[in-house]
Amino acid sequence: MAKTALKNKAAAKPKFKVRAYTRCQVCGRPHSVYRKFGLCRICLREKAHRGELPGVTKSSW
């Protein structure tokens, strides 16, 4: 889990646009965040398995 200070820092509007970065809305993880959902890969997988994300299905090929 991310520290509260880092979550707040990411939420604040930066002075320069290039300093902005995405964090997971659930756990605050800064890496591998899917912009479409606002979730990291781990939280995305958990929510998809529980059926909390409509339209997301497990792929099979």
Swiss-Prot record:
Keyword hit for Secreted: no
Cofactor: Zn(2+)
Cofactor note: Binds 1 zinc ion per subunit.
PROSITE patterns assigned to the protein according to its UniProt record, in alphabetical order: RIBOSOMAL_S14 (PS00527)
GO molecular function annotations of the record: rRNA binding; structural constituent of ribosome; zinc ion binding
Residues holding Zn(2+): C24, C27, C40, C43
Stretches that traverse the bilayer: none
Keyword Zinc: yes
Key words of the record: Metal-binding, Ribonucleoprotein, Ribosomal protein, RNA-binding, rRNA-binding, Zinc
Any one biological process term the GO annotation gives: translation
Record's GO cellular component terms: cytoplasm; small ribosomal subunit
Gene3D superfamilies in the cross-refs: 30s Ribosomal Protein S14, Chain N
Family in the record: Belongs to the universal ribosomal protein uS14 family. Zinc-binding uS14 subfamily.
Subunit structure: Part of the 30S ribosomal subunit. Contacts proteins S3 and S10.
Task performed by this protein: Binds 16S rRNA, required for the assembly of 30S particles and may also be responsible for determining the conformation of the 16S rRNA at the A site.
Protein name from the UniProt record: Small ribosomal subunit protein uS14
Species name: Bifidobacterium adolescentis (strain ATCC 15703 / DSM 20083 / NCTC 11814 / E194a)
